Structure formats: structure tokens, C-alpha cells
Amino acid sequence: MMKVIPLGERLLIKPIKEEKKTEGGIVLPDSAKEKPMKAEVVAVGKIDDEEKFDIKVGDKVIYSKYAGTEIKIDDEDYIIIDVNDILAKIEE
């Protein structure tokens, strides 16, 4: 994979795609699905206050629906997003 390092207080995240089915069992195409808002953190830029913002590579997060810039790396979808658009960290 090409290495992408976010600049400033930004993250590189990979959306977690969940297969969406109707109640009747029909799998919906990507164009009919809502944009995913869960992602895995792939790279972290320079965070000014790391104690306040405890996000690291591998964490799963929920982000603002229309935030960030979508990019493709090796035919995979990623988003470069500002840390302020991260709404929550998912702990499993």
C-alpha cells in the first residue's frame, strides 16, 4: 500500500462497509445505501493535544456524515478527515 501521511490535525480513515439488506433479503447496491459513518483509523497526523484527543491507528471511530475528502489508494476507499469531525471512538 502506498503510504499516505495526513498533515496537520487530520486522520486517514477507512470506512467500514456493512452489507445492507432490505427486510425481504434484497442486497442494496452501493448507490442506494446511506454513506457509512464508521471507520478504522489508518494514519494519524500531528495532533496538538494528544491527551485530549486519544485516537491512534487501529481505533474504530464514528465521523460526521459529509466530512472529509474521499480518496482511493490501491483501489480501496479512504477519507482524509479533520480530527474535529470525529464524533466518537468505538470501544468493543
From Swiss-Prot:
Primary localization class, coarse: cytoplasm
Keyword Chaperone in annotation: yes
GO cellular component, one term: cytoplasm
Gene Ontology BP terms: chaperone cofactor-dependent protein refolding
Keyword Chaperone: yes
Keywords, alphabetical: Chaperone, Cytoplasm
Function: Together with the chaperonin GroEL, plays an essential role in assisting protein folding. The GroEL-GroES system forms a nano-cage that allows encapsulation of the non-native substrate proteins and provides a physical environment optimized to promote and accelerate protein folding. GroES binds to the apical surface of the GroEL ring, thereby capping the opening of the GroEL channel.
Protein name: Co-chaperonin GroES
Organism this protein belongs to: Thermotoga petrophila (strain ATCC BAA-488 / DSM 13995 / JCM 10881 / RKU-1)
Gene name of the record: groES
